[in-house]
A protein has these predicted regions:
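Extracellular/periplasmic envelope-modification machinery, especially enzymes
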Residues: 1-250
Length: 250
């Protein structure tokens, strides 16, 4: 799915529940999660949320092409007009990446000279204001490793001798990563105070319930990460029941 395309998946002709999942690649890795929720009749996925919150307004020094469309109203109008009984908007972005100094606000879009945190908050709220007052779910973070999972597998199962430095990064202490999670959760909670229809979903503890997080956990035979920071299909499907319970309570 490229920036200007929308993936649509319908499991039935019912018009009870619809989910619109949007953001960057950290929204895309929740596609199997949403797909696994049985009582959702239709879901939509595109990257408009990323474009409207980040892509149009921030630039990273290594980024060459910005493929964001500046007119995303067609899909938004279509979603607003769709006649589902309940609609949910789920937004997931790798905010900890965009908060890094490599990412700069394009000056012509920041006439009020806001700092990056306040600027991104404003863009979240501006994006959500284009929709009617549906239930909104903002997703925090998943555990992030410093090493690609493929490297972990080679180190532990295919190499003659285990490299302990790599091993410690493949099985990392949760407390070393939680600061990032707490920062993003706090940031999203500030956004949620602006509207009563915004909820925060934090999958971190579900994915890493113990003191050590694993790219791949051989004891449970569970791949959590596809690479360093994206969920495996297995881990994404694993979250379906948890996200369903979360949605059912809203």
């Amino acid at each position: 799915v490229n920036t200007n395309e929308t993936l649509t998946c319908s499991s039935s002709s019912k018009k009870s529940r619809a989910v619109y999942l949007t953001g960057d690649s950290h929204a895309a890795h929740f596609l199997p999660t949403v797909d696994g929720i049985k009582n959702i009749d239709t879901f939509y996925y595109n990257e408009i949320g990323n474009c409207e919150i980040i892509g149009k307004y921030l630039i990273e020094r290594k980024l060459i092409n910005n493929k964001c469309s500046f007119n995303n109203n067609e899909f938004i109008e279509k979603f607003n007009k769709s006649n589902f009984e309940k609609k949910f908007i789920i937004i997931s972005l790798r905010l900890s990446e965009y908060f890094k100094t490599d990412w700069k606000i394009i000056e012509r879009y920041n006439q009020n000279k806001l700092n990056k945190f306040d600027f991104i908050k404003e863009k979240y709220l501006n994006f959500l204001s284009k929709f009617e007052k549906y239930n909104v779910i903002l997703i925090t973070t998943v555990p992030e490793s410093q090493v690609h999972t493929e490297k972990c597998i080679f180190n532990e199962f295919l190499n003659k001798k285990i490299n302990n430095q790599i091993y410690s990064k493949c099985h990392f202490k949760k407390k070393m990563d939680l600061k990032r999670n707490k920062l993003i959760k706090s940031f999203l909670e500030e956004i949620s105070t602006k509207n009563s229809n915004i909820s925060i979903y934090d999958p971190y503890e579900k994915l890493c319930p113990d003191d050590i997080c694993h790219n791949y956990d051989p004891k449970k035979d569970f791949f959590m990460l596809h690479d360093k920071d994206h969920l495996s299909i297995e881990a994404s499907k694993f979250l379906s029941d948890d996200l369903k319970l979360f949605i059912d309570k809203i």
